[in-house]
Amino acid sequence: MRLILSALLAVMLLVPTVYAYDKEMAKKFDAMFSQMTPEVLTLRPCQITTKDILEMIKKKEDFVILDIRTPAETKLIAPVWKGSLIIPMHELFKPENLAKLPKDKKIAVLCHTGDRAAAATIALRAVGFNNAFQFKGGIAEFAKEVGRLATEYVKE
């Protein structure tokens, strides 16, 4: 009987922690993600492709590449776009870095594969940068699609 009571007590003490979560943070995420309905995403996609970037370059559109790769990554794969902002993801949301971001032109958020750029884009949009777009596939996809022609679009 004592063993059963001990087990029951242990379960009662552990159950609340299993179901516990940060309710305030969940409310913030709900406010952010509830805006991303299929209709909104269809009308205003959050991604920009290599093809889109090349078209923008061709048309001489004014946009900014926000390179959020780490310093080690930017040394490993050196080319960056002319006029790009290089702000590592772990420093992006510091007030002085957010102040560098334009509000009046597209921001293509770039990382190596596009995964971190997706997270950063969602967060940037959540704080008011609705002009931020994930550079789909990142620099890896750009290099794959453009190949040797990449030197036409980048500088060392």
Region roles according to the model:
Residues I65-D67:
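Structural scaffold elements adjacent to functional motifs in cytosolic proteins
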Residues V109-C111:
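Short, surface-exposed ligand- or partner-binding patches at beta-edge/loop junctions that are enriched
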